Amino acid sequence: MSETAPVAQAASTATEKPAAAKKTKKPAKAAAPRKKPAGPSVSELIVQAVSSSKERSGVSLAALKKSLAAAGYDVEKNNSRIKLGLKSLVNKGTLVQTKGTGAAGSFKLNKKAESKAITTKVSVKAKASGAAKKPKKTAGAAAKKTVKTPKKPKKPAVSKKTSKSPKKPKVVKAKKVAKSPAKAKAVKPKASKAKVTKPKTPAKPKKAAPKKK
């Protein structure tokens, strides 16, 4: 009995060790980074909703929530974010609170913020239209490049230079040949004048004397 007891204890310790090892092997999962919500932020949505409204007295919180919900924003989950966004926009000066206090009143865009909101809308529309038109431009540019490439091998400048060079010695030789015969012709008439001799006049025949009878 004394021998079997330590064997059982050793077996129990052996089974406990791998279990502990398995626990230590499990790596701790790294905290997954929070994904930023795609699309515009809450403050941008609020500014767009206020700028689109035509109420002169300002937009109430209820009307603002309705416009945000119509745009596809989850108002119930992000109720606190909407209130914080309104407060931050009022502090920055982009929104002006016309009625009430805090986030429960009515809000209106500041005149300076209105011009900024219009420019942002125009820039967003221009970017969207530019992104849609980009593939057409690239295709046209590629076609233009392919047409322009065969025009490059027009470089016969070397042939023009070589044709000009032989013309110069030809002009010089022609001038020398023209001058040399002129000099020879001028010398020949002088020699002919020296050789001219006057013809001799023939002697008159003497009359024969008459014979004596």
Curated annotation (Swiss-Prot):
Pfam family, one: Linker_histone
Keywords for this protein: Acetylation, Chromosome, Citrullination, DNA-binding, Hydroxylation, Nucleus, Phosphoprotein
Disruption phenotype: Deficient-mice developed normally until the adult stage. No anatomic abnormalities are detected, mice are fertile and they show normal spermatogenesis and testicular morphology. The lack of phenotype may be due to a compensatory function of other histone H1 subtypes.
Compartments reported by the entry: Nucleus; Chromosome
Gene Ontology biological process terms, A to Z: nucleosome assembly; positive regulation of receptor-mediated endocytosis; spermatogenesis
First and last residue of the signal peptide: none
Basic residues composition bias: residue spans: 20-37, 145-178, 185-213
Domain notes: The C-terminal domain is required for high-affinity binding to chromatin.
Similarity-based family: Belongs to the histone H1/H5 family.
Role according to the record: Histone H1 protein binds to linker DNA between nucleosomes forming the macromolecular structure known as the chromatin fiber. Histones H1 are necessary for the condensation of nucleosome chains into higher-order structured fibers. Also acts as a regulator of individual gene transcription through chromatin remodeling, nucleosome spacing and DNA methylation.
Name of the featured protein: Histone H1.1
Organism: Mus musculus
Organism lineage string: Eukaryota, Metazoa, Chordata, Craniata, Vertebrata
